[in-house]
Amino acid sequence: MRYLPLTPEDRAQMLGVIGAPDVDALFADVPAAARNPAIGLAPHAGELEVERELSGLAALNRAAGAGPFFCGAGAYRHHVPATVDHIIQRSEFLTSYTPYQPEIAQGTLQVLFEFQTQVARLTGLDVANASMYDGSTACAEAVMMAQRVTRREKAILSGGLHPHYAATTQTIAHAEGMEIVRQPAAIDAEAAVIEAIDAETACVVVQTPNVFGVVTDVSKIAEAAHAKGALLIVVTTEAVAYGLLKSPGEMGADIAVAEGQSIGNALNYGGPYVGLFACREKFVRNMPGRLCGETVDAEGRRGYVLTLSTREQHIRREKATSNICTNSGLCALAFSIHLSLLGGKGLSQLARVNHARARELKAAVEAAGLEVLTPRFFNEIAVRTKGPAADLVERLLADGVVAGVPFSRLDPGAGLDDVLLLCATETTTSDDIAALKDALAR
């Protein structure tokens, strides 16, 4: 986006056209006391003083890498190569704005085109868009897309879906008249989902690995949904799992959405993240967001442009499929760079390392006398604690161990106060796992 200066002459000309004597006249309807209220800011300070102040505030936090760290539950700590941050800080890329002018944004458009290709290959589906805000909003958009495709109103959310994804979907989709059937939290939710599908169902939303870490082959759910004319939406919160598990497309998914934070992006205090969205080609005109397409110019040279951008800034609001605006383009770039550095074999190896660390974690937890509830897992497990999981987390924190996420923090009303979610990635060491085991034994 280019900067357009506003000179005193320009300002005077505009004021003259509207008949205003000065800029203050534009705000005459605002009470004088409310125009420039005293804010009470601290006195100004130099750069060194500000740096000291902010460093002191930052020191109150505990960095994820400061000790043994086992938190996951939708946000995962992975190693991000220094190359990623170096490339995304190039001036050609350092923006989240939409590349509306293809003649000056070919680099950004090509990167997004490659991003779409990568997402389509990971999910096993035909077409992917140029990213969503995050995984949860992508989930909500997928449900509304299913409403448009099937012209039905009911969406069934599996009990294994991350509670925050379910809540976000309820918040957004209810405004479109959707009936959101949210099933109770369950470690193994496959049978309940299949039983709930009927002729009124627009879509079924399942997550694998689910919020409890359970890996599920959703092929049977796909068959049951399609038999009733419903769509299957598969959610993934840990994108590294694509390197080891069956893709959603292989299992019969019509739409796949995911959180892409695990690849190329840090934890970032919970955001910004990047949503992945893919579907079968026959549904592409109902897909939200933007797509980048490859074309040729008048001289036959290859180029990239925005295409099928059915959002309300581009077409009539009543015809739009979404209102996604300035979004996660920079995070999508980071995702694409990291994945390109890994390659297919590298992603597979990374996924296997994650699974191996999780197996080591499971063995340590069981050796400490706790029950592991997750039968099939990737890099995350659910553990039953002896008492409230939140109390155990606080106790272990005093020992310097960040021992996962109590499920009660995600869904306080689920009645699963004694369930703790633990995650291990390639950043987790054997010493970290030993420290957790020792802390649990005390």
Swiss-Prot record:
Positions in coiled-coil regions: none
Enzyme Commission number(s) of this protein: 1.4.4.2
EC class (word): oxidoreductase
One GO MF term attached to the UniProt entry: glycine dehydrogenase (decarboxylating) activity
Gene Ontology BP annotations: glycine decarboxylation via glycine cleavage system; nucleoside metabolic process
Reaction catalysed by this enzyme: N(6)-[(R)-lipoyl]-L-lysyl-[glycine-cleavage complex H protein] + glycine + H(+) = N(6)-[(R)-S(8)-aminomethyldihydrolipoyl]-L-lysyl-[glycine-cleavage complex H protein] + CO2
Pfam family, one: GDC-P
InterPro entries: GcvPA, GDC-P_N, GDC_P, PyrdxlP-dep_Trfase, PyrdxlP-dep_Trfase_major, PyrdxlP-dep_Trfase_small
SUPFAM superfamilies: PLP-dependent transferases (SSF53383)
Cystine crosslinks: none
Classification via Gene3D superfamilies: Aspartate Aminotransferase, domain 1, Type I PLP-dependent aspartate aminotransferase-like (Major domain)
CDD domains found in the cross-reference section: GDC-P (cd00613)
Keyword Protein biosynthesis: no
Keywords assigned by UniProt, alphabetized: Oxidoreductase
Function: The glycine cleavage system catalyzes the degradation of glycine. The P protein binds the alpha-amino group of glycine through its pyridoxal phosphate cofactor; CO(2) is released and the remaining methylamine moiety is then transferred to the lipoamide cofactor of the H protein.
Subunit structure: The glycine cleavage system is composed of four proteins: P, T, L and H. In this organism, the P 'protein' is a heterodimer of two subunits.
UniProt record similarity statement: Belongs to the GcvP family. N-terminal subunit subfamily.
NCBIfam families on file: PRK00451.1 (NF001696)
Stated name of the protein: Probable glycine dehydrogenase (decarboxylating) subunit 1
Organism whose genome encodes this protein: Phenylobacterium zucineum (strain HLK1)
